Amino acid sequence: MTFLRPILALLAATALVTTSAQVDGGYSKKEVTPEDMELLQKAQSNVSAYNSDVTSRICYLKVDSLETQVVSGENYKFHVSGCSVNSDNELGGCANQNCESSKYDIVIYSQSWTNTLEVTSITPVK
């Protein structure tokens, strides 16, 4: 039985490290997948998916990184380079790749079992 102690100690240490890396209720870094890009394009290009208090209108040039947060669905925080636009027809990926870009955080809430997809915030990064 003494040979099991080191194994159990290793398993306990692994569990502790794994749980401390994920902050409860916090955001976790995530590799951007094609499905994530599809979700961003679908939500960000559709003005009817915008929460009523989201007044910023941008197109995105590229996704720099992504974080997710599990809530009653999932929050996706896309860190993007993008440009301010004047028309809802310009939302989504930037058609003009030569626009003057800035950094933004776009938060999208998704709840797959209710088909909810909502842009909850677009914030310039300072």
Curated annotation (Swiss-Prot):
Q: Using the record, list the residue span of the signal peptide; answer none if the entry has no such feature.
A: 1-21
Question: Glycosylation: which residues?
Answer: 46
Q: What induces it?
A: Expression is up-regulated during infection of host tomato.
Q: Per UniProt, what is one GO molecular function of this protein?
A: cysteine-type endopeptidase inhibitor activity
Chief location of this protein within or outside the cell: secreted
One GO CC term, this protein: extracellular region
Q: What is this protein called?
A: Cystatin-like cysteine protease inhibitor EPIC1
- Tell me the organism: Phytophthora infestans (strain T30-4)
Gene that this sequence comes from: EPIC1
